[in-house]
Amino acid sequence: MVRGRSVSTNKLYDVVYIVKEDPNNEELRYSIRSVEENFPVRYIWIFGYCPRWLSNIIYVPVKQDGDKWSNSKKLFETIANASFLPDQFVLFNDDFFVMEKIDTPEHHYDGLLIDRINYLEDKFKNISPLYATQLRQVYDRLQELGIKDPKNYALHTPMPFSRLEMKKSLELTKDLPMSLRSFYANYFNVGGVEGPDCKVFRLGEYNVDGPYLSTDDSTFRLGQVGRDIRAKFDKPSSHE
């Protein structure tokens, strides 16, 4: 097991997007604009669905015909087994935006995993807390593997990965629901930077401190955060 991790500086990174089926996907358009402007990117890879307006990328189609969790697992398994993909890459969702210049991408967590689980179980105690249940199963597996006090890395930020280590993580959790980020980062002890998540759920004013933002469908289309992102990255990228 790798213990301790530093990500090398002064280099370019392969950016891997997992992309849902959406022929328009304006979030992806602006995410890529933000990457081209602010992130040390070498190549952009698209796993999943590729809108027709997107060009100058490396595309790996993945059929997504299941629910959210099974689709995610299929995408990650495809990435992990893609021998043509460099071992080191940075994983993006299509609703991640790089708002400031980044030289070296880091791992991000917001505290202990058990605290996040307890919060979710309390918040959703009167309904089925599926996500909390998934996180608890991952927490229990980490405990079985001797990893005490694991951190919560399930945030909406770009995340550096080793493809081979991703593959090992998926093998060790193949009987569990999907929560790859927290298992991977704790099992391989990547360390990182502690801070709050950057996901914006409010349509109005928002307060996010840091180099990244993430939106949902409504906040990107209708919210102040979406207007700010579109205004900041108003010029087409070389991938349009």
Predicted ranges, named:
Residues 129-220:
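Catalytic core and acceptor-binding pocket of nucleotide-sugar-dependent glycosyltransferases
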Residues 100-131:
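Conserved donor-nucleotide/metal-binding helix-loop-beta segment in metal-dependent transferases, i.e.
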Residues 25-36, 62-92:
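A conserved donor-nucleotide-binding helix/loop in the catalytic core
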Residues 1-66, 190-191, 208-240:
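N-terminal anchoring/stem segment of glycosyltransferases
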Residues 96-97:
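Acidic metal-phosphate-binding loop of nucleotide-sugar-dependent transferases
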